[in-house]
């Protein structure tokens, strides 16, 4: 491809509303253009990259035995009402009416549509297992679209759905898809981690997320430094570093604390180590009108997902209001504690191993110090309530936990029978009786993968693509292309490289565009391999080669360029 025949839309300036580096560089490199909040047009340069992601995804899905389909973006409300998600999904679901006033939505996901297809097409266990996938535009009406493609409203997604007569078959396909996902991200040259995850609003019983590691990631990715254990922050089990509760060394005492409404103030004004404090959080219970006390250490954070898994706690998690606290306890949020608390209490594992600690006295502006379990109050129910922190023991008993930031690019679920039961999707089993199908679902954010790859690989000059993702593998930059000797050598090399199967961008802009601008544009776009053709080099029988990640260029004999690139470029 020649730049004279291409839409080369690079920009020098970074748009003011672009915050994360992938958004900035995709705009500056001419990959995308903003149409409206959370909506982007893909330009030729960006689309070449996304098509490469799609191609790898397709190859791995096909290899895993999945069959490609294409479902409508617009879905009838009846299916969502049948599954119960029409009311549950909330404002992210873009709803609309047709001219006949019938309700529809723009699909954020396709569980209902695919289950409807399966119940109409499948009748016997002999047709199973069946795994169908599509690569299609999705829409979620995010309240605050931000970070470019990282959290837009419209995006390209690969979503697959599998149907099974039993759990064993589902597990087999799930494992195969897990491996296929690992193959995809490995082939794309990404540093990623698959992690155990919560199933969230999709539902089901078992899931894994796939995260590309990047400092700009929105999610915490947890993994062991000595094993293959990995989970997201919602799912990671928090194991206390302590194994035995120390014996008491202090007497229980009531202390005036008028200037200690927060943990930080308690530590600063009263000299209590933060690990000797607790947070008493009052939440609404699953039973109407009941409040539950959840207690974590002062330097730990409550994990809301873990909390809502407790049968006593309402889902979603709702904190008690100040009025509810006053009515039930007689004190405000900054003075609460488990001693003489007239509520059901659940404490975190780390709290159960504390001694000589401080708690609110359930009296405004007063705390108890020197509190000890069993001596001053009984040990209540103990549960895993907190987020893990770096350095915690790994739950598998091997090593300690490391926390890095990650960008979620894939998620796979074992849905079980959640949707098939709701939509009555069943077949006749081997015994001739109806069997409700078990389902799996498997998503990859295709457009997000492009942005995540940039977040993982860039410098102050621009994007650094690997060979698998680069829009072009080779930038061919002639200096003084208008001269006959340079033009002939360049055109001949361009033809040879193209015939050899390389993806080449020939920068044939005229002499008004300086060599410095050409080099800067190719580095901004991130093309991995650059060949410079100059009259001086040709006079010596050489061309100049430079890799995007290297500081210095090297001279290459003209007759060795093709062999060199065939060995260097990964295809």
Swiss-Prot record:
Which Gene3D superfamilies does the UniProt entry name for this protein?
Answer: Anticodon-binding domain (3.40.50.800), Bira Bifunctional Protein, Domain 2 (3.30.930.10)
Give compartment(s): Cytoplasm
- Does the keyword field hold Translocase? no
Q: Does the keyword ATP-binding apply?
A: yes
**Family named by the database record:** Belongs to the class-II aminoacyl-tRNA synthetase family. ProS type 1 subfamily.
Q: How does it assemble?
A: Homodimer.
**UniProt-recorded name of the protein:** Proline--tRNA ligase
